[in-house]
Amino acid sequence: MEFIQFLQGELLLTGTLFALIILLIVNLYSEKYRKYQVVDTNGAVSLMDDDELIIIDVREEKERKAGFLSNDLNIPMGQVKAKMDTLDKSKNILVYCKSGTRSDRIADILSKNDFQKVSSLKGGFNAWAKADLPIKR
């Protein structure tokens, strides 16, 4: 009874706690049922052993001035759905952006459209550059 009274008296704390629990559940659920892989820079380098790997940069053209990965395709996020039909669904695909947020969204879209081997670069181009891996300008 005292616990319920405490929760009623501390509505901000209760609401925050409830929101955190919901976010935790959503995060655990999304990771378990995600159809694509999230790879770090080492995982991305390993994927590059595949000569047929398709690397997709979903950043806008102006963002590429900071550099880009060798042999990538620049398909800005807003154009991916329109250009999906030009990609081979059977090949490994590595998607990256600046920080990993947009690439996760695009990797999810690709995997839901029957692309079988999709990976998103965790930390995006920022992580790649921070790891001092080769970039093109």
Kindly give the residue locations of the regions a language model identified:
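The conserved Walker
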Residues: S99
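Rhodanese-like catalytic fold shared by cysteine-dependent sulfurtransferases
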Residues: M1-T41, D50, E61-N92, R102-R137
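Short, surface-exposed ligand- or partner-binding patches at beta-edge/loop junctions that are enriched
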Residues: Y96
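Structural scaffold elements adjacent to functional motifs in cytosolic proteins
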Residues: I55-D57
